[in-house]
Amino acid sequence: MAGPPALPPPETAAAATTAAAAASSSAASPHYQEWILDTIDSLRSRKARPDLERICRMVRRRHGPEPERTRAELEKLIQQRAVLRVSYKGSISYRNAARVQPPRRGATPPAPPRAPRGGPAAAAAPPPTPAPPPPPAPVAAAAAPARAPRAAAAAAAATAPPSPGPAQPGPRAQRAAPLAAPPPAPAAPPAAAPPAGPRRAPPPAAAVAARESPLPPPPQPPAPPQQQQQPPPPPPPQQPQPPPEGGAARAGGPARPVSLREVVRYLGGSSGAGGRLTRGRVQGLLEEEAAARGRLERTRLGALALPRGDRPGRAPPAASARAARNKRAGEERVLEKEEEEEEEEDDEDDDDDVVSEGSEVPESDRPAGAQHHQLNGGERGPQTAKERAKEWSLCGPHPGQEEGRGPAAGSGTRQVFSMAALSKEGGSASSTTGPDSPSPVPLPPGKPALPGADGTPFGCPAGRKEKPADPVEWTVMDVVEYFTEAGFPEQATAFQEQEIDGKSLLLMQRTDVLTGLSIRLGPALKIYEHHIKVLQQGHFEDDDPEGFLG
Protein backbone atom coordinates (compact mmCIF):
# COMPACT_ATOMS: atom_id res chain seq x y z
CA MET A 1 0.00 0.00 0.00
CA ALA A 2 2.07 2.88 1.29
CA GLY A 3 5.41 1.02 0.99
CA PRO A 4 6.24 1.52 -2.73
CA PRO A 5 5.93 5.34 -2.83
CA ALA A 6 8.51 5.57 -0.05
CA LEU A 7 11.38 4.03 -2.02
CA PRO A 8 11.69 5.99 -5.36
CA PRO A 9 12.39 9.58 -4.20
CA PRO A 10 15.61 9.52 -2.10
CA GLU A 11 15.89 13.29 -2.22
CA THR A 12 12.55 13.52 -0.41
CA ALA A 13 13.93 11.41 2.42
CA ALA A 14 17.11 13.49 2.55
CA ALA A 15 15.07 16.68 2.66
CA ALA A 16 12.97 15.10 5.38
CA THR A 17 15.99 14.27 7.51
CA THR A 18 17.42 17.78 7.18
CA ALA A 19 14.04 19.35 7.90
CA ALA A 20 13.57 17.07 10.89
CA ALA A 21 17.02 17.89 12.22
CA ALA A 22 16.42 21.61 11.74
CA ALA A 23 12.77 21.94 12.77
CA SER A 24 12.26 19.47 15.63
CA SER A 25 15.23 17.84 17.29
CA SER A 26 12.97 15.43 19.21
CA ALA A 27 11.82 13.43 16.15
CA ALA A 28 14.13 10.83 14.63
CA SER A 29 14.44 10.39 10.88
CA PRO A 30 12.42 7.42 9.64
CA HIS A 31 15.42 6.04 7.74
CA TYR A 32 17.61 6.25 10.80
CA GLN A 33 14.87 4.76 12.93
CA GLU A 34 14.52 1.83 10.56
CA TRP A 35 18.30 1.33 10.33
CA ILE A 36 18.83 1.43 14.08
CA LEU A 37 15.88 -0.86 14.86
CA ASP A 38 16.96 -3.36 12.20
CA THR A 39 20.49 -3.29 13.57
CA ILE A 40 19.28 -3.92 17.13
CA ASP A 41 17.05 -6.79 15.95
CA SER A 42 19.79 -8.43 13.90
CA LEU A 43 22.29 -8.15 16.75
CA ARG A 44 19.79 -9.69 19.16
CA SER A 45 18.99 -12.48 16.70
CA ARG A 46 22.71 -13.34 16.62
CA LYS A 47 22.77 -13.32 20.43
CA ALA A 48 25.12 -10.32 20.37
CA ARG A 49 24.54 -7.61 22.97
CA PRO A 50 23.47 -4.45 21.08
CA ASP A 51 25.55 -1.83 22.85
CA LEU A 52 26.29 1.64 21.47
CA GLU A 53 29.59 0.71 19.85
CA ARG A 54 28.19 -2.29 17.98
CA ILE A 55 25.13 -0.37 16.78
CA CYS A 56 27.22 2.55 15.46
CA ARG A 57 29.70 0.22 13.77
CA MET A 58 27.01 -1.86 12.07
CA VAL A 59 24.98 1.16 10.89
CA ARG A 60 28.14 2.70 9.47
CA ARG A 61 29.11 -0.52 7.68
CA ARG A 62 25.64 -1.02 6.19
CA HIS A 63 24.44 2.51 5.48
CA GLY A 64 27.41 4.87 5.87
CA PRO A 65 26.46 7.50 8.51
CA GLU A 66 28.99 8.54 11.10
CA PRO A 67 28.78 7.20 14.67
CA GLU A 68 28.03 10.69 16.07
CA ARG A 69 24.91 10.99 13.92
CA THR A 70 23.83 7.46 14.80
CA ARG A 71 24.30 8.25 18.48
CA ALA A 72 22.16 11.40 18.19
CA GLU A 73 19.40 9.53 16.34
CA LEU A 74 19.50 6.75 18.93
CA GLU A 75 18.96 9.31 21.69
CA LYS A 76 15.93 10.65 19.84
CA LEU A 77 14.52 7.13 19.52
CA ILE A 78 15.03 6.63 23.24
CA GLN A 79 13.10 9.85 23.93
CA GLN A 80 10.30 8.61 21.65
CA ARG A 81 10.33 5.29 23.51
CA ALA A 82 10.89 3.38 20.30
CA VAL A 83 14.16 2.09 21.79
CA LEU A 84 14.71 1.11 25.41
CA ARG A 85 17.99 1.62 27.23
CA VAL A 86 18.73 -1.41 29.43
CA SER A 87 21.45 -1.56 32.07
CA TYR A 88 22.46 -5.11 32.89
CA LYS A 89 25.44 -5.96 35.13
CA GLY A 90 26.95 -2.52 34.64
CA SER A 91 26.83 -2.53 30.82
CA ILE A 92 24.26 -0.58 28.81
CA SER A 93 22.51 -2.15 25.83
CA TYR A 94 19.52 -1.14 23.74
CA ARG A 95 16.32 -2.97 22.88
CA ASN A 96 13.59 -2.54 20.30
CA ALA A 97 10.53 -1.41 22.27
CA ALA A 98 8.20 -3.19 19.84
CA ARG A 99 9.72 -6.52 20.90
CA VAL A 100 9.53 -5.81 24.62
CA GLN A 101 5.88 -6.10 25.58
CA PRO A 102 5.56 -8.11 28.84
CA PRO A 103 7.37 -5.74 31.23
CA ARG A 104 5.14 -2.80 30.26
CA ARG A 105 2.35 -2.11 32.70
CA GLY A 106 -1.12 -3.52 31.96
CA ALA A 107 -0.42 -4.33 28.29
CA THR A 108 -1.44 -0.80 27.21
CA PRO A 109 2.00 0.69 26.40
CA PRO A 110 2.78 -1.59 23.43
CA ALA A 111 0.70 1.04 21.61
CA PRO A 112 3.59 3.56 21.06
CA PRO A 113 5.50 1.50 18.47
CA ARG A 114 2.23 0.35 16.94
CA ALA A 115 0.59 3.77 16.80
CA PRO A 116 2.02 5.03 13.49
CA ARG A 117 1.86 1.50 12.04
CA GLY A 118 -1.79 1.07 12.93
CA GLY A 119 -2.88 4.34 11.35
CA PRO A 120 -1.72 4.43 7.75
CA ALA A 121 -5.12 5.75 6.76
CA ALA A 122 -4.77 8.55 9.28
CA ALA A 123 -1.26 9.35 8.06
CA ALA A 124 -2.34 9.29 4.43
CA ALA A 125 -4.77 12.18 5.00
CA PRO A 126 -2.27 15.10 5.31
CA PRO A 127 -0.38 14.91 1.94
CA PRO A 128 -2.31 17.86 0.39
CA THR A 129 -1.16 20.16 3.23
CA PRO A 130 2.40 19.07 4.00
CA ALA A 131 3.59 22.32 5.51
CA PRO A 132 1.72 22.80 8.83
CA PRO A 133 2.57 20.16 11.45
CA PRO A 134 -0.50 20.67 13.75
CA PRO A 135 -3.11 18.76 11.64
CA PRO A 136 -1.50 15.30 11.87
CA ALA A 137 -1.36 15.44 15.66
CA PRO A 138 -5.14 15.61 16.31
CA VAL A 139 -5.74 13.04 13.57
CA ALA A 140 -3.32 10.63 15.20
CA ALA A 141 -4.83 11.34 18.59
CA ALA A 142 -8.30 10.65 17.20
CA ALA A 143 -7.09 7.40 15.66
CA ALA A 144 -6.08 6.10 19.08
CA PRO A 145 -8.76 7.28 21.54
CA ALA A 146 -8.35 4.51 24.10
CA ARG A 147 -4.58 4.79 24.47
CA ALA A 148 -2.57 6.47 27.19
CA PRO A 149 -1.79 10.20 26.71
CA ARG A 150 1.93 9.39 26.59
CA ALA A 151 1.32 7.02 23.67
CA ALA A 152 -0.73 9.68 21.86
CA ALA A 153 2.04 12.23 22.39
CA ALA A 154 4.63 9.81 21.02
CA ALA A 155 2.43 9.09 18.00
CA ALA A 156 1.96 12.82 17.39
CA ALA A 157 5.72 13.37 17.64
CA ALA A 158 6.35 10.49 15.22
CA THR A 159 4.00 11.97 12.60
CA ALA A 160 5.30 15.54 13.07
CA PRO A 161 7.81 15.73 10.10
CA PRO A 162 5.84 17.66 7.48
CA SER A 163 6.89 16.65 3.97
CA PRO A 164 7.22 12.84 3.99
CA GLY A 165 3.51 12.24 4.54
CA PRO A 166 3.18 9.23 2.25
CA ALA A 167 6.79 8.21 2.84
CA GLN A 168 6.35 7.65 6.56
CA PRO A 169 4.17 4.52 6.50
CA GLY A 170 6.65 2.97 4.04
CA PRO A 171 9.46 2.01 6.42
CA ARG A 172 6.91 1.30 9.11
CA ALA A 173 5.09 -1.09 6.78
CA GLN A 174 8.40 -2.72 5.89
CA ARG A 175 9.21 -3.12 9.55
CA ALA A 176 5.75 -4.49 10.20
CA ALA A 177 6.39 -7.43 7.87
CA PRO A 178 8.99 -9.18 10.08
CA LEU A 179 6.71 -8.54 13.02
CA ALA A 180 3.97 -10.59 11.30
CA ALA A 181 1.36 -7.83 11.26
CA PRO A 182 -0.13 -6.48 7.98
CA PRO A 183 -0.18 -2.66 7.76
CA PRO A 184 -3.93 -2.03 7.31
CA ALA A 185 -5.19 -4.53 9.88
CA PRO A 186 -3.58 -3.47 13.17
CA ALA A 187 -6.00 -0.58 13.68
CA ALA A 188 -8.26 -2.89 15.70
CA PRO A 189 -5.73 -4.94 17.75
CA PRO A 190 -4.39 -2.01 19.79
CA ALA A 191 -7.91 -1.28 20.98
CA ALA A 192 -8.47 -4.91 21.94
CA ALA A 193 -4.99 -5.35 23.42
CA PRO A 194 -5.43 -3.49 26.74
CA PRO A 195 -8.23 -5.68 28.16
CA ALA A 196 -6.31 -8.86 27.30
CA GLY A 197 -4.51 -8.66 30.64
CA PRO A 198 -7.31 -8.47 33.21
CA ARG A 199 -10.17 -9.91 31.08
CA ARG A 200 -10.43 -13.08 29.02
CA ALA A 201 -12.08 -11.87 25.75
CA PRO A 202 -14.33 -8.82 26.13
CA PRO A 203 -15.89 -7.03 23.15
CA PRO A 204 -13.64 -4.25 21.78
CA ALA A 205 -16.29 -1.61 22.46
CA ALA A 206 -16.10 -2.29 26.20
CA ALA A 207 -12.33 -1.76 26.40
CA VAL A 208 -12.57 1.49 28.34
CA ALA A 209 -15.19 0.11 30.70
CA ALA A 210 -13.04 -2.96 31.27
CA ARG A 211 -10.09 -0.76 32.22
CA GLU A 212 -12.17 1.37 34.55
CA SER A 213 -13.76 -1.56 36.42
CA PRO A 214 -11.32 -4.47 36.67
CA LEU A 215 -12.58 -5.53 40.10
CA PRO A 216 -15.75 -7.62 39.40
CA PRO A 217 -14.09 -10.43 37.38
CA PRO A 218 -11.34 -11.50 39.87
CA PRO A 219 -13.62 -12.73 42.71
CA GLN A 220 -15.05 -15.44 40.44
CA PRO A 221 -12.05 -17.83 40.35
CA PRO A 222 -11.75 -18.23 44.16
CA ALA A 223 -15.42 -19.23 44.40
CA PRO A 224 -14.81 -23.01 44.68
CA PRO A 225 -12.63 -22.76 47.84
CA GLN A 226 -15.30 -20.60 49.50
CA GLN A 227 -17.88 -23.15 48.50
CA GLN A 228 -15.94 -25.78 50.36
CA GLN A 229 -15.48 -23.81 53.56
CA GLN A 230 -18.73 -21.99 54.22
CA PRO A 231 -22.15 -23.19 53.04
CA PRO A 232 -23.66 -20.91 50.36
CA PRO A 233 -27.39 -21.13 49.64
CA PRO A 234 -27.12 -22.73 46.13
CA PRO A 235 -25.67 -26.18 47.06
CA PRO A 236 -28.56 -27.56 49.22
CA PRO A 237 -30.81 -28.42 46.22
CA GLN A 238 -27.87 -30.19 44.54
CA GLN A 239 -26.53 -31.69 47.74
CA PRO A 240 -28.90 -34.62 48.40
CA GLN A 241 -28.44 -36.05 44.90
CA PRO A 242 -24.77 -37.15 44.70
CA PRO A 243 -24.39 -39.26 47.89
CA PRO A 244 -27.13 -41.92 47.31
CA GLU A 245 -25.91 -42.68 43.80
CA GLY A 246 -22.20 -41.99 44.27
CA GLY A 247 -21.12 -44.89 42.07
CA ALA A 248 -23.49 -43.92 39.27
CA ALA A 249 -22.38 -40.32 39.41
CA ARG A 250 -18.79 -41.42 39.02
CA ALA A 251 -19.60 -43.90 36.27
CA GLY A 252 -21.34 -41.43 33.96
CA GLY A 253 -21.54 -37.65 33.76
CA PRO A 254 -19.08 -35.05 35.01
CA ALA A 255 -17.87 -35.50 38.58
CA ARG A 256 -18.67 -32.60 40.90
CA PRO A 257 -16.33 -31.93 43.83
CA VAL A 258 -17.98 -32.71 47.16
CA SER A 259 -17.51 -30.18 49.93
CA LEU A 260 -16.59 -31.19 53.46
CA ARG A 261 -19.93 -30.02 54.79
CA GLU A 262 -21.83 -32.20 52.34
CA VAL A 263 -19.82 -35.22 53.45
CA VAL A 264 -20.62 -34.46 57.09
CA ARG A 265 -24.33 -34.03 56.30
CA TYR A 266 -24.39 -37.32 54.41
CA LEU A 267 -22.69 -39.18 57.25
CA GLY A 268 -25.25 -37.84 59.69
CA GLY A 269 -22.91 -35.71 61.78
CA SER A 270 -23.83 -32.26 63.07
CA SER A 271 -22.17 -29.88 60.61
CA GLY A 272 -22.21 -26.73 62.73
CA ALA A 273 -21.74 -28.26 66.17
CA GLY A 274 -17.98 -27.96 66.62
CA GLY A 275 -17.31 -24.72 64.79
CA ARG A 276 -15.01 -24.80 61.77
CA LEU A 277 -14.92 -27.96 59.68
CA THR A 278 -11.48 -29.46 59.27
CA ARG A 279 -10.26 -32.29 57.16
CA GLY A 280 -9.35 -34.22 60.28
CA ARG A 281 -12.92 -34.10 61.60
CA VAL A 282 -14.37 -35.27 58.31
CA GLN A 283 -11.81 -38.05 58.11
CA GLY A 284 -12.78 -39.12 61.60
CA LEU A 285 -16.45 -39.35 60.60
CA LEU A 286 -15.53 -41.31 57.48
CA GLU A 287 -13.52 -43.74 59.57
CA GLU A 288 -16.38 -44.17 62.02
CA GLU A 289 -18.74 -44.99 59.16
CA ALA A 290 -16.35 -47.42 57.46
CA ALA A 291 -15.44 -49.16 60.72
CA ALA A 292 -19.09 -49.46 61.72
CA ARG A 293 -19.89 -51.15 58.40
CA GLY A 294 -17.03 -53.58 58.91
CA ARG A 295 -15.34 -52.48 55.69
CA LEU A 296 -12.18 -51.31 57.44
CA GLU A 297 -10.34 -52.33 60.59
CA ARG A 298 -8.87 -49.92 63.07
CA THR A 299 -5.21 -50.41 63.89
CA ARG A 300 -3.48 -49.71 67.17
CA LEU A 301 -2.55 -46.13 66.32
CA GLY A 302 -6.09 -45.22 65.32
CA ALA A 303 -5.57 -45.47 61.56
CA LEU A 304 -7.78 -47.66 59.41
CA ALA A 305 -6.66 -50.46 57.12
CA LEU A 306 -8.39 -52.93 54.83
CA PRO A 307 -9.45 -56.25 56.38
CA ARG A 308 -6.92 -59.02 56.06
CA GLY A 309 -8.97 -61.01 53.56
CA ASP A 310 -9.05 -58.16 51.07
CA ARG A 311 -5.31 -57.62 50.85
CA PRO A 312 -2.69 -60.00 49.42
CA GLY A 313 0.20 -60.73 51.74
CA ARG A 314 3.00 -58.72 50.12
CA ALA A 315 1.14 -56.53 47.64
CA PRO A 316 1.80 -52.79 47.87
CA PRO A 317 -1.01 -50.75 49.44
CA ALA A 318 -2.03 -49.20 46.10
CA ALA A 319 -2.63 -52.61 44.51
CA SER A 320 -4.57 -53.90 47.50
CA ALA A 321 -6.71 -50.77 47.56
CA ARG A 322 -7.45 -51.22 43.84
CA ALA A 323 -8.38 -54.87 44.34
CA ALA A 324 -10.67 -53.93 47.20
CA ARG A 325 -12.30 -51.20 45.14
CA ASN A 326 -13.00 -53.66 42.33
CA LYS A 327 -14.98 -55.82 44.75
CA ARG A 328 -17.24 -53.05 45.94
CA ALA A 329 -19.72 -50.72 44.29
CA GLY A 330 -21.85 -47.69 45.09
CA GLU A 331 -21.39 -45.54 48.14
CA GLU A 332 -19.15 -47.98 49.99
CA ARG A 333 -16.70 -47.76 47.11
CA VAL A 334 -16.71 -43.95 47.34
CA LEU A 335 -16.21 -44.05 51.10
CA GLU A 336 -13.38 -46.51 50.91
CA LYS A 337 -11.59 -44.69 48.08
CA GLU A 338 -11.63 -41.46 50.06
CA GLU A 339 -10.49 -43.33 53.13
CA GLU A 340 -7.56 -45.04 51.44
CA GLU A 341 -6.32 -41.81 49.83
CA GLU A 342 -6.60 -39.80 53.02
CA GLU A 343 -5.00 -42.53 55.09
CA GLU A 344 -1.99 -42.78 52.79
CA GLU A 345 -1.50 -38.99 52.74
CA ASP A 346 -2.30 -37.94 56.28
CA ASP A 347 -1.79 -41.03 58.41
CA GLU A 348 0.72 -39.42 60.75
CA ASP A 349 -0.57 -35.84 60.46
CA ASP A 350 -4.15 -36.61 61.42
CA ASP A 351 -3.32 -39.22 64.03
CA ASP A 352 -4.31 -36.96 66.93
CA ASP A 353 -7.52 -35.95 65.15
CA VAL A 354 -8.50 -39.58 64.76
CA VAL A 355 -7.92 -40.32 68.41
CA SER A 356 -9.97 -37.33 69.47
CA GLU A 357 -12.77 -38.50 67.18
CA GLY A 358 -12.55 -41.91 68.81
CA SER A 359 -12.99 -40.29 72.20
CA GLU A 360 -16.06 -38.33 71.03
CA VAL A 361 -17.96 -41.41 69.86
CA PRO A 362 -18.61 -43.99 72.62
CA GLU A 363 -16.40 -47.06 72.49
CA SER A 364 -19.38 -49.41 72.54
CA ASP A 365 -20.70 -47.99 69.25
CA ARG A 366 -17.66 -48.90 67.18
CA PRO A 367 -16.05 -52.20 68.16
CA ALA A 368 -19.32 -54.14 67.90
CA GLY A 369 -19.07 -54.55 64.13
CA ALA A 370 -15.32 -54.60 64.05
CA GLN A 371 -15.02 -57.20 66.81
CA HIS A 372 -17.55 -59.33 65.04
CA HIS A 373 -15.46 -59.25 61.89
CA GLN A 374 -12.20 -59.74 63.68
CA LEU A 375 -13.29 -62.68 65.79
CA ASN A 376 -14.70 -64.55 62.80
CA GLY A 377 -11.30 -65.79 61.75
CA GLY A 378 -12.73 -68.27 59.28
CA GLU A 379 -13.98 -65.58 56.90
CA ARG A 380 -10.55 -64.08 56.33
CA GLY A 381 -7.75 -65.01 53.96
CA PRO A 382 -4.08 -65.26 54.92
CA GLN A 383 -2.78 -62.80 57.45
CA THR A 384 -1.09 -59.73 55.93
CA ALA A 385 2.26 -58.33 56.90
CA LYS A 386 0.87 -55.11 58.33
CA GLU A 387 -1.70 -56.84 60.51
CA ARG A 388 0.94 -59.23 61.85
CA ALA A 389 3.09 -56.27 62.80
CA LYS A 390 0.23 -54.61 64.67
CA GLU A 391 -0.65 -57.92 66.31
CA TRP A 392 2.86 -58.50 67.55
CA SER A 393 3.12 -54.98 68.84
CA LEU A 394 0.06 -55.49 71.06
CA CYS A 395 1.14 -58.69 72.76
CA GLY A 396 1.89 -58.43 76.42
CA PRO A 397 5.52 -58.59 77.55
CA HIS A 398 6.93 -61.95 78.44
CA PRO A 399 6.65 -62.60 82.16
CA GLY A 400 10.36 -63.33 82.48
CA GLN A 401 11.38 -60.16 80.69
CA GLU A 402 8.91 -57.80 82.31
CA GLU A 403 11.29 -56.43 84.92
CA GLY A 404 13.65 -53.68 83.86
CA ARG A 405 11.66 -52.68 80.79
CA GLY A 406 9.36 -49.73 80.38
CA PRO A 407 5.67 -50.07 79.53
CA ALA A 408 4.91 -52.24 76.55
CA ALA A 409 4.58 -50.68 73.13
CA GLY A 410 0.86 -51.26 73.07
CA SER A 411 0.12 -49.67 76.44
CA GLY A 412 0.17 -46.04 75.22
CA THR A 413 -2.79 -43.72 75.46
CA ARG A 414 -3.37 -43.82 71.70
CA GLN A 415 -4.67 -47.39 71.78
CA VAL A 416 -8.29 -47.07 70.74
CA PHE A 417 -9.51 -50.65 70.55
CA SER A 418 -9.47 -53.08 73.43
CA MET A 419 -7.05 -55.97 73.48
CA ALA A 420 -9.83 -58.47 73.05
CA ALA A 421 -10.90 -56.90 69.76
CA LEU A 422 -7.41 -57.33 68.37
CA SER A 423 -6.89 -61.05 69.04
CA LYS A 424 -7.07 -62.03 65.40
CA GLU A 425 -7.04 -65.85 65.11
CA GLY A 426 -10.47 -67.41 65.47
CA GLY A 427 -9.84 -70.43 67.67
CA SER A 428 -6.22 -70.08 68.64
CA ALA A 429 -6.52 -67.69 71.58
CA SER A 430 -9.55 -67.90 73.80
CA SER A 431 -10.54 -64.39 74.78
CA THR A 432 -13.92 -62.92 75.52
CA THR A 433 -15.18 -59.51 74.53
CA GLY A 434 -16.01 -58.57 78.07
CA PRO A 435 -14.34 -55.61 79.71
CA ASP A 436 -12.41 -57.71 82.22
CA SER A 437 -10.78 -60.14 79.83
CA PRO A 438 -7.03 -60.62 80.36
CA SER A 439 -5.01 -58.42 78.02
CA PRO A 440 -1.89 -60.60 77.54
CA VAL A 441 -2.62 -63.45 75.18
CA PRO A 442 -1.57 -66.75 76.85
CA LEU A 443 1.17 -68.71 75.10
CA PRO A 444 0.55 -72.32 74.12
CA PRO A 445 2.42 -74.78 76.36
CA GLY A 446 4.73 -76.17 73.66
CA LYS A 447 6.12 -72.83 72.46
CA PRO A 448 8.08 -70.91 75.05
CA ALA A 449 9.05 -67.34 74.31
CA LEU A 450 12.63 -67.07 73.11
CA PRO A 451 14.56 -63.88 73.82
CA GLY A 452 15.76 -62.02 70.74
CA ALA A 453 19.09 -60.41 70.07
CA ASP A 454 18.40 -57.58 72.49
CA GLY A 455 16.45 -59.62 75.04
CA THR A 456 12.96 -58.88 73.70
CA PRO A 457 10.55 -61.81 73.51
CA PHE A 458 9.04 -63.19 70.36
CA GLY A 459 6.43 -66.03 70.54
CA CYS A 460 3.46 -63.78 71.22
CA PRO A 461 0.52 -65.01 69.13
CA ALA A 462 -0.25 -68.67 68.94
CA GLY A 463 0.40 -70.54 65.74
CA ARG A 464 2.95 -68.06 64.31
CA LYS A 465 6.43 -69.36 63.63
CA GLU A 466 9.09 -67.67 65.68
CA LYS A 467 11.55 -65.12 64.41
CA PRO A 468 14.94 -66.62 63.46
CA ALA A 469 17.72 -65.98 65.92
CA ASP A 470 20.09 -64.91 63.14
CA PRO A 471 19.21 -61.39 61.88
CA VAL A 472 20.37 -62.33 58.37
CA GLU A 473 17.33 -64.59 58.00
CA TRP A 474 14.81 -61.99 59.16
CA THR A 475 12.08 -61.05 56.73
CA VAL A 476 10.73 -57.53 56.35
CA MET A 477 8.00 -58.32 58.86
CA ASP A 478 10.53 -59.66 61.35
CA VAL A 479 12.38 -56.33 61.16
CA VAL A 480 9.12 -54.42 61.59
CA GLU A 481 8.18 -56.62 64.53
CA TYR A 482 11.61 -56.13 66.11
CA PHE A 483 11.38 -52.33 66.06
CA THR A 484 7.75 -52.36 67.13
CA GLU A 485 8.66 -54.40 70.20
CA ALA A 486 11.61 -52.11 70.84
CA GLY A 487 9.20 -49.19 71.21
CA PHE A 488 9.36 -47.62 67.74
CA PRO A 489 6.05 -48.56 66.08
CA GLU A 490 5.83 -45.45 63.90
CA GLN A 491 9.41 -45.84 62.71
CA ALA A 492 8.84 -49.54 62.05
CA THR A 493 6.40 -48.62 59.29
CA ALA A 494 9.22 -46.71 57.56
CA PHE A 495 11.29 -49.90 57.52
CA GLN A 496 8.28 -51.73 56.10
CA GLU A 497 7.72 -49.14 53.34
CA GLN A 498 11.38 -49.39 52.29
CA GLU A 499 11.12 -53.22 52.47
CA ILE A 500 14.21 -53.61 54.64
CA ASP A 501 14.83 -57.21 55.63
CA GLY A 502 17.51 -58.58 57.93
CA LYS A 503 20.28 -58.56 55.34
CA SER A 504 19.58 -54.94 54.40
CA LEU A 505 19.35 -54.01 58.08
CA LEU A 506 22.82 -55.36 58.79
CA LEU A 507 24.21 -53.40 55.84
CA MET A 508 22.67 -50.06 56.82
CA GLN A 509 25.03 -47.17 57.52
CA ARG A 510 24.37 -44.34 59.96
CA THR A 511 23.41 -41.93 57.18
CA ASP A 512 20.96 -44.45 55.74
CA VAL A 513 19.04 -44.49 59.01
CA LEU A 514 19.21 -40.74 59.67
CA THR A 515 18.38 -39.47 56.19
CA GLY A 516 17.15 -42.34 54.04
CA LEU A 517 14.08 -43.42 55.99
CA SER A 518 12.25 -40.09 56.50
CA ILE A 519 12.01 -40.55 60.25
CA ARG A 520 12.73 -37.99 62.95
CA LEU A 521 16.29 -37.46 64.09
CA GLY A 522 15.85 -38.48 67.73
CA PRO A 523 14.27 -41.91 67.12
CA ALA A 524 16.64 -42.48 64.19
CA LEU A 525 19.69 -41.94 66.41
CA LYS A 526 18.32 -44.29 69.08
CA ILE A 527 17.43 -46.93 66.49
CA TYR A 528 20.91 -46.85 64.98
CA GLU A 529 22.99 -46.60 68.15
CA HIS A 530 21.06 -49.03 70.38
CA HIS A 531 19.71 -51.53 67.86
CA ILE A 532 21.18 -51.60 64.35
CA LYS A 533 24.74 -51.02 65.54
CA VAL A 534 24.38 -53.65 68.27
CA LEU A 535 22.96 -56.18 65.81
CA GLN A 536 25.76 -55.49 63.34
CA GLN A 537 28.48 -55.84 65.96
CA GLY A 538 27.02 -59.06 67.29
CA HIS A 539 26.57 -60.53 63.83
CA PHE A 540 29.95 -59.62 62.37
CA GLU A 541 31.75 -60.81 65.50
CA ASP A 542 30.01 -64.18 65.42
CA ASP A 543 29.89 -64.90 61.67
CA ASP A 544 32.44 -64.49 58.94
CA PRO A 545 31.60 -61.76 56.43
CA GLU A 546 32.09 -64.02 53.38
CA GLY A 547 29.29 -66.31 54.35
CA PHE A 548 27.00 -63.36 55.00
CA LEU A 549 27.80 -61.48 51.83
CA GLY A 550 27.75 -64.62 49.73
Curated annotation (Swiss-Prot):
Q: Which parts of the sequence belong to the SAM domain? A: 474-542
Q: What PROSITE patterns does this protein's entry cite?
A: SAM_DOMAIN, SAMD1_WH
* Start-end of Acidic residues biased regions: 337-355
Q: Which UniProt keywords apply?
A: Chromatin regulator, Chromosome, Nucleus, Phosphoprotein, Secreted
Listed under GO biological process in this entry are: chromatin organization; foam cell differentiation; lipoprotein lipid oxidation; negative regulation of transcription by RNA polymerase II; negative regulation of transcription initiation-coupled chromatin remodeling; protein homooligomerization
Main localization (coarse): nucleus
User: What's the record's remark on domains?
Assistant: Winged-helix (WH) domain directly recognizes and binds unmethylated CpG-containing DNA via simultaneous interactions with both the major and the minor groove of DNA.
Q: Where is the composition biased (Pro residues)?
A: 1-11, 125-138, 180-205, 214-245, 437-448
What is this protein's function per UniProt? Unmethylated CpG islands (CGIs)-binding protein which localizes to H3K4me3-decorated CGIs, where it acts as a transcriptional repressor. Tethers L3MBTL3 to chromatin and interacts with the KDM1A histone demethylase complex to modulate H3K4me2 and H3K4me3 levels at CGIs. Plays a role in atherogenesis by binding with LDL on cell surface and promoting LDL oxidation which leads to the formation of foam cell.
* Positions of modified residues (Phosphoserine): 163, 270
Q: Which SUPFAM superfamilies match?
A: SAM/Pointed domain
This protein's assembly is summarised as:
Homopolymerize into a closed pentameric ring. Interacts (via SAM domain) with L3MBTL3 (via SAM domain); the interaction mediates L3MBTL3 binding to chromatin. Interacts (via WH domain) with KDM1A; the interaction modulates KDM1A function.
User: What subcellular compartments does it reside in?
Assistant: Nucleus; Chromosome; Secreted
Transport recorded as keyword: no
Q: What is this protein called?
A: Atherin
| Sites of Phosphothreonine modification | 108
Q: Which organism is it from?
A: Oryctolagus cuniculus (Rabbit)
**Which residue ranges have biased composition labelled Basic and acidic residues?**
290-300
Q: Which residues form the SAMD1-like winged helix (WH) domain?
A: 24-100
Entry-linked SMART domains: SAM
A GO molecular function term, named singly, is: chromatin binding
Q: Name one GO cellular component term.
A: chromosome
Q: Where is this region: Disordered?
A: 1-32, 93-468
By its UniProt entry, which InterPro entries does this protein fall under? SAM, SAM/pointed_sf, SAMD1-like_SHD, SAMD1-like_WH
